[in-house]
From Swiss-Prot:
Disordered: region residues: 594-614
InterPro entries: C5orf34-like, C5orf34-like_2nd, C5orf34-like_C, C5orf34-like_dom, C5orf34-like_N
TM helices/strands, residue ranges: none
Name listed for the protein in its UniProt record: Uncharacterized protein C5orf34 homolog
Source organism: Rattus norvegicus (Rat)
Length: 640
């Protein structure tokens, strides 16, 4: 069975994957990677209302018809995923490696070591870990880098009952004690020095408190003893390749990346081509944040089976007619992490604002810039001689395509703009469940603790209802049926609100009564200015009020308890207000006058307290019923 070529591959923030093929078929991977859904392309003679054929299987038990496509989809997922999924049954044997130890971290060389940093003729710096279990490659452009590391294959759930700390520990019978010098700090336990035989000590510092006082103590270190064949268990590991942007480097790769960047900063491009370049001249930075740590904790592979398969969400069209009418390219309700489209890679970050980087594949990069997302794109490239070229493109004034160019700048930027617009809609939607996925749900974790809570709710007469959530999302419902959603940093100080520092995303989402929505720039709202101004003013007032309190954040609004006790508490408050308002005194005076005129016997009311209470309750209920009927009548008139 021939396999069609991939046209678009999308990796979302929850590590789910969607692949579109040239023949119209699609493949979707669950966030954990343990399950996939393949939707075949319908033949041309298919009725428009006929549903396409779908195959849903476990990844570990994939049949041969979809093995090749699934392998490429998993490689794309693992290249930028937080935790890889490595099924031993579908991984080629040349990528597997059997070792006698189960390790979870690697140690990188100090900057004064020149035997672990190499420079190739193609202009790539390679930094190898001391144990050889990982290495990082940084090209001359320094825009992106690749890292290769050994990772243990995915295990069955029953073999992963032990905690990670216990599983990563080598058994005592496999260890032979030897003495080592450990460099410790009185303030920082992560600082240490490791010694191997006949090697000088290497100081490995974490990213914080690098100037802490250091003293060395003697300790027993485990040394791995080579087991005899057939007596010790061998662990299957797989070489995993990941690609990252240098501007948004994960924490575990910051230290080796800093070594590669210092190599280019200290060694000129002309002398870097020389194979005899001394790397020992590279010194560490005085800034501990830039230095990072010398030990990287490797990503761990997910389990073969998912513990929450009910959370797998599949996106597909029910018919060919719906597929043709749906023009949305990215319809999955999740933020996008990486897009591969016709050989071009798009990488996104969602820290404070949505930003995107375009890697055409020739060593150059396009980066989104500007106050609003994607208003401008900066182009940067570097040739073999080290000469850099930079340009700036405006989204509203893109250059025409030129014959002979490797790619169309107009097409690349337009595609990036569509991706950014999708991410803006997701960030401005009220579907808060996009933060929850199956592999993040550890046993015993409450989903409600992950979802945002309501912080503030206000009902403004004549305007509408305003709500603020803990994920910095503000939602407003106006009286005319229009709803507005924007992101506002509720922890921003009142002094900065005049420049709208609290406005995290310079866009807002308007939803009209007919269900249509539209993205509006908050600084240029046009005819929707009154909606945007009302919400921004309310957010400013909210941050000013919260800044006067001791707590930097607003406290969550407690949920109403619709129990009998709460209702009785409301009745008691109502009675207290009624007694202190003077209404009861007025009615009691009228009753006394009526009793005196009718020559009532004194003490008659006291002799029958139960009858009086029952009568007063019945009268109150009757009046309440009449008031409710009047309210219902008025509401029915307004509806007409």
């Amino acid at each position: 069975m021939g396999t069609a070529a991939e046209v678009r591959m999308v990796l979302y923030e929850d590590d789910s994957v969607q692949v579109n093929y040239a023949d119209g078929s699609t493949l979707q991977l669950s966030p954990c990677g343990s399950e996939f859904l393949f939707e075949k392309a319908p033949p041309p003679s298919t009725h428009p209302l006929e549903q396409p054929e779908r195959i849903r299987q476990r990844t570990h038990f994939v049949i041969s018809n979809y093995r090749e496509q699934l392998q490429r989809a998993l490689d794309f997922r693992n290249s930028s995923a937080t935790c890889p999924f490595l099924s031993e049954s579908i991984i080629p044997s040349e990528r597997k490696k059997r070792v006698f130890i189960d390790f979870s971290e690697v140690e990188w060389p100090s900057p004064d070591r020149d035997d672990c940093i190499t420079y190739s003729e193609s202009g790539i710096v390679k930094i190898t870990s001391l144990d050889g279990h990982a290495y990082l490659c940084l090209p001359r452009s320094q825009h992106e880098f690749t890292v290769h590391f050994l990772c243990k294959v995915s295990q069955k759930p029953d073999s992963s009952v032990m905690p990670p700390e216990t599983k990563n520990r080598v058994p005592k019978e496999e260890l032979v004690g030897k003495t080592r010098n450990v460099c410790r700090s009185g303030r920082l336990s992560g600082q240490r020095l490791r010694n191997k035989e006949n090697e000088p000590p290497r100081q490995l510092l974490t990213s914080k408190n690098a100037s802490a006082n250091i003293h060395c103590v003697s300790e027993t270190e485990g040394r791995e003893e080579l087991p005899s064949p057939g007596t010790k268990r061998r662990y299957v590991h797989v070489w995993v390749k990941q690609s990252w942007s240098a501007a948004s480097c994960p924490e575990e790769w910051k230290y080796p990346l800093s070594l590669g960047l210092r190599f280019y900063n200290k060694v000129p491009a002309a002398s870097a081509a020389d194979a005899e370049v001394p790397v020992s001249g590279i010194v560490t930075s005085d800034n501990p944040e830039e230095r990072g740590t010398g030990v990287s904790v490797l990503p761990r592979a997910l389990l073969l089976s998912c513990s929450a398969p009910h959370m797998h969400r599949w996106n597909f069209c029910d018919s060919l007619l719906q597929r043709q009418s749906d023009a949305e390219e990215y319809s999955y309700p999740e933020l996008i992490k990486v897009v591969w489209y016709k050989g071009v890679t798009y990488r996104l970050t969602h820290k404070n604002v949505n930003s995107i980087e375009i890697f055409p594949g020739d060593g150059s990069v396009f980066k989104s810039e500007g106050t609003h997302f994607g208003n401008y794109f900066t182009y940067s490239s570097q040739d073999n001689s080290g000469k850099r070229e930079e340009k700036t493109y405006s989204v509203n004034n893109l250059p025409p395509d030129r014959p002979g160019n490797l790619y169309s700048v107009r097409s690349l930027i337009k595609q990036a703009t569509r991706i950014l617009q999708h991410c803006a809609k997701i960030r401005l939607s009220l579907s808060h469940n996009y933060r929850v996925c199956c592999w993040r749900m550890a046993p015993g974790v409450n989903v409600s603790s992950i979802l945002p809570v309501l912080l503030k709710e206000s009902l403004i007469p004549g305007v509408g209802r305003f709500l603020a959530y803990s994920d910095d999302k503000v939602h407003a419902v106006f009286l005319d049926g229009v709803t507005l959603t924007l992101n506002w940093d509720l922890s921003s100080s009142a002094e900065k609100t005049q420049v709208d520092q609290g406005l995290r995303l310079r866009w807002c989402r308007l939803t009209f009564p007919d269900g249509q929505d539209q993205l509006i720039q908050t600084e240029h709202p046009g005819v929707y200015e009154r909606y945007v101004t009302s919400v921004v003013t309310w957010c400013r007032r909210l941050t000013q009020t919260s800044s006067r309190h001791v707590s930097p954040r607003l406290s969550p609004v407690p949920e109403e308890n619709w129990s009998v006790a709460s209702e009785l508490e409301k009745i008691q408050k109502f009675n207290w207000l009624l007694e202190n308002s003077g209404v009861l005194n007025l009615t009691s005076g009228k009753k006394n006058e009526q009793c005196s005129s009718d020559h009532c016997k004194p003490g008659s009311s006291e002799t029958l307290p139960e009858a009086t209470n029952e009568e007063s309750v019945s009268v109150a209920l009757k009046r309440t019923s009449e008031v409710l009927q009047d309210i219902d009548y008025l509401l029915s008139l307004t509806r007409k």
